[in-house]
Each structure stands twice: as structure tokens, then as C-alpha cells.
Amino acid sequence: DGLSIKGNVEKVYDGWRFPKEWITTGFGLEAPKVRYINGYYYLMCAEGGTLGPPTAHMAVLARSKSINGPWENSPYNPVVHTSDNDEKWWNKGHGSLIDTPDGNWYIVYHAYEKGYLNLGRQTLIEPLEWTNDGWLRLKKGVACDKPIKKPITSQGQVGMLQHLSEFRVGKEWRFYREFSSDRYSVDANTITIQGKGDSPHNSSPLLFVGGCHAYELEVEIEFEGDATAGLVLWYNNKYMVGAGISPTARYSYRRESTSRRGSHKETSRIWLRLKNDHHIVSGTYSLDGKTWLKDDWGMEISGFNNNTLGGFMSMLPGIFTCGN
């Protein structure tokens, strides 16, 4: 059933031993993936640890005529690896071998972007080439921090965020951990969400992957009942920042704390903006959708990343509603 082990566990591969002087999190052999190519089983694994020092992670390759080994390590290992802290992409590793219909080979792997660790692990693709002795290695003359030719011509441009205002829950948008279809409804680019909890921290906010260094979110909010709504940049329910607004008051949020920032004439409709300018977060609000006002708060969020907080999360923008 794919859920249990039958027979005795047998060790068949020891991994590739990288030089002792490399700075890693540990040996950490993981993520085996096998492809059968031209009479060989090619085994790609990750080593070095996903988080921690920029040079920690890597992807290594071995091959064997039999799935049971013995396994021969590639003389070109590691296939991908961050060798210097000055590189744009850190912790490169955990790769998969991919071939295209026209017979070309690529490696797809994840890495952190230097200076933007709070975006989480991002997906990269690089072309591979076959050596004369039958190994796959990175294609010479190609750098992962420069544009490369696409493997296959796109049939149409599909922007990651082009459908964002349609509130397609389960696609671009996802509730944090707890999902209930009874809690929301969508009609004509407007989403109605039932408030949950008494603060954004326990509200199970609705989030999406921003994937950008800098951006601004704007939302028009219409209240019913005693509710608070707003915009957040969310790592988890302990570590987040954001701005909230009720019919009469305004709030800012940092980690687990809530600060009241001001009050305004009671209204059932209000506009809110949250700006992330390369880790510097600020917010503004409007009572008419035209004149924008600013409260005295701002935050810096570069430290909200896995190396600091753990959990392999990232800062996700989104919206929340709490209260009744």
C-alpha cells in the first residue's frame, strides 16, 4: 500500500563525502530520487542541510547498473552547490532530473535568495549536459543568476498573480492551517469572510505567495457587525506584522503584540494599504478611497526567516478578519 516497509531494511548507498573544510549544517543525506537512463540507474540525493550557512546544501549524483548498487559517485559532484557567500542564490540543493520532449536535460532545485531569505525557498531550473563518460553536469557557460533560454516555448503568458482579485481559494489563496468552506463566499471579485478569533493571530488569515522584493497591497473593506479586518505579512501565528482596522479604530501588529494606533469617525467602509519596500513595512488608510492617511508606525522584517525562526516558512501577504 506504499505506507509500510516489507522485508529487512538494507543500506545500499553511503552518499558522497564532501570536503571537510566546507561549511555545512551536517552530512544530512536525504531526498533520494532515481531515474533510469541508458542502462544506468541515476540516483540524485541532497546533502549538507537545507538551512543554515549559505554553502550548506547541495545535490549529488551517483549511478549503478542495479537498483541495489553498488553505487558509483559522479566525479563532477556536487551537481549544484553554493560555493561562496557572495552568490545570489544560497543553499542550492534538493534537485530533480528533468528531461524535455526534445531530449534536453535540466535540474530543478530550490534555493534561498541572498538578502531575501524571508521569501522562503524558491524554485530554480538550470540546463545540464552529458559528459563523454556518461554523467550529467551543469551546462558550461550558464549562470543561475542570469536569464536562460526556456526549455519549451510558452503557449501563453500566465502571471502568478493575475487572478489574485478573483479570490480563488485553493489556488492562489489559502487559509492558514484551518479551512472551512462555510466561512467565506466569493461574488464578482468580492470575498465575504466570517470573522474568527479575537486578533489576526488566531484568525486563520487568507494568504498567497507574493514572491516579490517589494509590493503594495490595497483592500476595500466593508464591515458588518463588531469585526476587525486588515492586511498581514505572515510567517506563522507567532511571527507576523500587519495593520488592522475596525469601524472606529486602527491597529498595528508585530509578532504577538497588538497596538492601537488611532480612532476615526464610525464607518462601515474603509480602505487599507500595506507596503513592503524591500523589508520596510508601512501602512496607510482612507475613509473615502481618495485621500490616504498614515499612522506613526513602521517595521523591518528581514529577520522573519527560517534561519531565525525555523519551520521552513516564508512571509506571505494576505487578509484577515476577526471578531463577530
Describe the role of every protein-language-model region.
Residues 1-324:
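Carbohydrate-active catalytic/glycan-binding domains of CAZyme proteins
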